Amino acid sequence: NIGPRTYAKICELLLRLKANHLAPAMHPVSTAFYKIPENKLVADTFAIVMGSSHCEPLLLNTASEWNSKTMGPWDYGKNKDKINEVLGNRVKENCAYENVYTLALRGLHDAAMGGGDVPMKEKVKMLESALKDQRNLIAEHIDRPVETIPQAFTPYKEVLEIYSNGLELPDDVTIIWPDDNFGYMKRLSGLHEQKRSGRAGVYYHVSYLGVPHSYLWYSTTPPALMYEELRKAYDTTADRIWLANCGDLKGAEMQVSLFLDMAYDIDSFNANNVVTYPARWLAKMFGEQYYSVFEDITSSHINLAFSRKPEYMGWGYWNNYWGGGEKRTDTEFSFANYNEAENRLNEYSRIGKKAENLLASLDKDSQPAFYQLLYYPVKGAELMNHMTIKGQYYRQYVRQQRAAANLIKEKVKNYHDSLQIITEGYNSLLNGKWKYMMSLKQNYEGSSSYFMLPLMEESYTPVGAPKLALQAESEILDKGGISYHSLPVYNTFSRKSHWVDVYNQGSGDLSWTAKSSNDWIIVSQKAGKTPTEDRIRVSVDWEKVPVGESIKGSVEFSSNDQKECVLVSVFNPASPVRDEMQGVYMEENGYVSIPAAGVHRKFESNDIKMNILPGVGVEGHALQLGNPISPLQMYRAGDVPRVEYDFYTFNAGIYDVYTYVLPTFPLHAERDYKLPEHTNSDTKYSVRIDDGSISTPSTSAIEYSQVWYDSVLKNCRVNKSTLYVKKPGKHTLQIRCGDPGVVIQKIVIDMGGLKRSYLGPESTKCN
């Protein structure tokens, strides 16, 4: 359990990290801090200022220390005197030590205070009364003016609604603004709150237990996101207390170091250098000669986890509240479209191999620390993604009756077993120094199942003679057997290649040949022999292909008496000329895809500057529409600050424009925040094509809604605007500033050809 020896190590670590404040473990599985008298002596020896979480008033761990059988209900309306007696004793016992006293009235176990359907006015009145009582207890036991004693109030979850409905809070109390548990600050100090003598602080999560899904295995919170959110907090007077929820700490060491370094000197950071923090942090420990490889591995690892954390790969929800456990399902990464799943797995394999090679090259004394800090997180994420996505591959292979199905099944089992092995390796380092510290299961029994072997109940054993079957890129088939297939249209402005899977549905070796109908069709392999499958790349020789908007050809695949044909269509118009379209985002297969950082023109003002943010967003870079604390903009005004992108379409019509945005909340200082915590006001920006109508989507969503669930799990809200394009040709897409600080990740325009995927297609820029 956690006692003085553990807290001595924690307090020493805090001093080494330039920290001086600790809110100890609060869940019943850990012995409450003040149940062991030596704990506070340890903290005092290290000059650590003790505090407590948002639901623990006056240092009392209500989840563990309140005994309803002997003390009565934890209900301020029914048991006020006993509650105040216990709280007063806690202050009396600890008044000789340095503390920050939390003023709070929440229920047990991080829940809302009970009492039924109480009108909001009564909730406000009750909380004000409780806070007044707690202030009186502090004044009674500490011989100093109460205004000089550090006190904190955290408007977390339902308490924010009460605060927003007129709660009167003493001016000297520090308001600790919380994030939404997923790294997005829900609210910051407005102009009137910035004048408070108590100023403000932050309560920020780099680890979390709760809905829609916990992330407790190890932290992958992006440094760029942390800086973007915490900088705007600091700039609005949240500079008094910074508190990070770091779970069991070991899995969040880099994020905790960054959090405290920013708390100590945030002005030494900016949007560019914070991205390299993980590499610099590692290089300081293992040698500057490894900096470039550290930067490559960490930037890719964080970017991959940005769109889906390893803990979320089961694609279900943390389900402890409703019973029955997490319901796992297929991921939304596409196997058929935009090479999405394949690219993700290939990138994980690349950085996993780099981390493996680096581990082997280090001296033995450095290997244990490197194993924990980089190798295990990267290799673990690689194996988790391969296990989950390949498990989904297996289920598809069975439906297609591919002979390779059982090979995939064995690989999935190996990924699962390897996860157990590297976790056991972590816990056996240095003769078991960190034994039990790392576990794949970081949750209540049954509430999450992301770490378990994927469902593979079906099986397929190929029988009979070898049998030819095909799947072409962007083709979704449950079974092979059709004799006609088509690839995505080849476009002279992108000049991509596409793939065809040649696979065997029988046993034995499948011998096959491929024959192109025209000399401008290039096949990567013209013949083969495989017991399972071959992937063939089909490309176009653009020096030989005729000019035209609908050039047709084909590739015929044969095996014995079987023949299957793949249609090859080429779009190679005489006009516009490819060289004249350099840098323009071109329509391709019925869509246009634009990375938000790939701006053609910026229109800025004294207040609003457009900034490229590296290290954040599904494309690795994103665009921020001004500083978050800048004045609100009139997004319909003609001269509003905006960015523009040039795109070209070959058809007119009504099209859907999808904007991928960071799911931030409205934080502008002049906003009216009198709203419940689960009905936050919208954070607006606007979208326009040419001089057409203006659409005004939002980045925020009602908390605990399905939109919010999806947005925080993806670190992205996808908004649809339906706009009109009058005629074919070159057009301008505008993204216009409304609430400053909105972060745009990418834009996709669907002309009718957009396929299903998780992150959308890659850029269609003509280069």
Residue ranges and their predicted role:
Residues N1, L13, D44-V49, S53-K121, ...:
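Aromatic- and acidic-residue-enriched carbohydrate-binding clefts of CAZyme catalytic domains
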Residues N1-G77, C95, A152-P155, G166-Y184, ...:
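Feature activates predominantly on carbohydrate-active enzymes
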Residues L15, N20-A23, S30, W177-G183, ...:
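Structured mid-domain segments that build the active-site/substrate or prosthetic-cofactor binding neighborhood
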Residues N20-L22, K40-V42, A47-H54, E98-T102, ...:
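Beta-sheet entry/capping signal
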Residues Y34, V42-D44, G72-S197, N343-A369, ...:
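Gly/Pro-rich turn-and-neighbor structural signature
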Residues F333-W499, V555:
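Histidine-centered catalytic/metal-binding microenvironments
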Residues H485-S486, F493-N767:
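Extracytoplasmic
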